């Protein structure tokens, strides 16, 4: 895909409007998880060091659109940036009719969702955003799947629209994993339901050499092989779909599983062959043989795309499958991309962050990209690059 990159532009003296993803959890006026801000800092620093007049904005939470609500203010983010950048960062509340900035100065524009017309991508608001800048930088992959005034409309109307370093890296990594992957490509899809990941599974079944399924999704595939899954979470109405997918793509299905009689953190894990699962059993994880077999598949992969844990890894007795998969990915010499909330939690839990080639910052956007959907913000950047 062809987009203009911020790093290729002359920024000195220019008014630069960065749409970042600063939607971070806040408690008692303090940022409690700074991962998204940390991811955005390099882009902000690059602009400041280049002598640009820098504006950065984001949404935060879900306020009623068009109404100011202190609970959803970006003020805690401004306080964080003051410390992180060791400079005076201002928060602008009324900015739609213009604001004055000096070169090397940073202003945070208050929560875009306080502006009426943001979510509906209204032209009037988009043009007001665009009038603030010489260069619009889209750097929020996490909201690239939404056509909103601050992610799409502004870019259509700004003098120049480009991809920030974070977004550019994301598109490059996902493109490398999906558009032109080194083979074999192994995709791992976990999660509770086939229905929520059906488009992902269908899309990946067409490009993956092997498609590994885990979590509740795997139970539907175990049932599709004719085995009893007891009281496990599975979708009987999607068994035929699972069988169809298994004909189209190599999907290694678990041969042994970790079961219990109740969904309980302290429940003892009972390892069983899939043919031995009883009517009152609930499958919560892969068994050791299945984990070892999948680890070997991952070990031979040249490209790995990972979305979702393969068991109830939050419970100590049912973490072995996801731990084994994580270890195999960490030890793999292949190019690995991971994304999705639960996946990131697993990466943190098993301490493999440094060993994954690329960790995606987007939840819904990551899934939509993997589904093969066009992301509106990316389509806008491609269109502007042609102009």
Swiss-Prot record:
GO BP field: gluconeogenesis; glycolytic process
Cleaved signal peptide residues:
none
Q: Name one Pfam family in it.
A: PGK
Q: How does it assemble?
A: Monomer.
Identify the metabolic or biological route this protein is part of. Answer: Carbohydrate degradation; glycolysis; pyruvate from D-glyceraldehyde 3-phosphate: step 2/5
Grouped into one coarse class, the protein's main location is cytoplasm
Look up keyword Nucleotide-binding and say if it applies. Answer: yes
What's the protein called, per UniProt?
Phosphoglycerate kinase
Annotated GO CC locations = cytosol
- Compartments it resides in: Cytoplasm
Taxonomic lineage of the native organism = Bacteria, Pseudomonadati, Pseudomonadota, Gammaproteobacteria, Vibrionales
Keywords on this record?
ATP-binding, Cytoplasm, Glycolysis, Kinase, Nucleotide-binding, Transferase
Species whose genome carries this gene: Aliivibrio fischeri (strain ATCC 700601 / ES114)
Coiled-coil regions in this chain?
none
Catalytic activity from the UniProt record: (2R)-3-phosphoglycerate + ATP = (2R)-3-phospho-glyceroyl phosphate + ADP
The UniProt annotation places ATP binding at 197, 314, 340-343
Top-tier EC class: transferase
GO MF annotation list: ADP binding; ATP binding; phosphoglycerate kinase activity
Q: What is its EC number?
A: 2.7.2.3
SUPFAM superfamilies attached to this UniProt entry = Phosphoglycerate kinase
Q: Which family does it belong to?
A: Belongs to the phosphoglycerate kinase family.
Q: Binding residues for substrate, per the UniProt record? A: 21-23, 36, 59-62, 113, 146
InterPro entries, per database record: Phosphoglycerate_kinase (IPR001576), Phosphoglycerate_kinase_CS (IPR015911), Phosphoglycerate_kinase_N (IPR015824), Phosphoglycerate_kinase_sf (IPR036043)
């Amino acid at each position: 895909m062809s987009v203009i990159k911020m790093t290729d532009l002359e920024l000195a003296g220019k008014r630069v409007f960065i749409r970042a993803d600063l939607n971070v959890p806040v408690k008692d006026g303090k940022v409690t998880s700074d991962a998204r801000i940390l991811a955005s800092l390099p882009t902000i620093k690059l602009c400041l060091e280049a002598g640009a007049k820098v504006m950065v904005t984001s949404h935060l939470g879900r306020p009623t659109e068009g109404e100011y609500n202190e609970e959803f203010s970006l003020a805690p983010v401004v306080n964080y940036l003051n410390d992180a950048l060791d400079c005076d960062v201002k928060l602008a509340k009324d900015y739609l009719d213009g604001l004055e900035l000096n070169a090397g100065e940073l202003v945070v524009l208050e929560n875009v969702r306080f502006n009426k017309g943001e979510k509906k991508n209204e032209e009037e608001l988009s043009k007001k955003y665009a009038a603030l800048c010489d260069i619009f930088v889209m750097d929020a992959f996490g909201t690239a799947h939404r056509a909103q005034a601050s992610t799409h409309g502004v870019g259509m109307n700004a003098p120049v629209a480009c991809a920030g370093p974070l977004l550019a890296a994301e598109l490059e990594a996902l493109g490398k994993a999906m558009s032109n992957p080194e083979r074999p490509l192994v995709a791992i899809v976990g999660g509770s339901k086939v229905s929520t990941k059906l488009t992902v599974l269908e899309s990946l079944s067409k490009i993956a050499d092997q498609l590994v399924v885990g979590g509740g999704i795997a139970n539907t595939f175990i049932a599709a092989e004719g085995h009893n899954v007891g009281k496990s979470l599975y979708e009987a109405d999607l068994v035929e779909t699972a069988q169809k997918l298994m004909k189209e793509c190599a999907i290694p299905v678990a041969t042994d599983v970790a079961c219990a009689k109740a969904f309980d953190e302290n429940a003892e894990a009972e390892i069983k062959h899939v043919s031995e699962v009883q009517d009152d059993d609930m499958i919560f994880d892969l068994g050791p043989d299945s984990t070892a077999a999948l680890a070997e598949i991952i070990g031979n992969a040249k490209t790995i795309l990972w979305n979702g844990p393969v068991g109830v890894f939050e419970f100590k007795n049912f973490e072995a499958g996801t731990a084994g998969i994580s270890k195999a990915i960490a030890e793999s010499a292949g190019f690995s991309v991971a994304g999705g909330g639960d996946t990131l939690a697993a990466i943190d839990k098993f301490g493999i962050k440094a060993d994954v080639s690329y960790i995606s910052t987007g939840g819904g956007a990551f899934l939509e990209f993997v589904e093969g959907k066009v992301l509106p913000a990316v389509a806008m950047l491609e269109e502007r690059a042609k102009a």
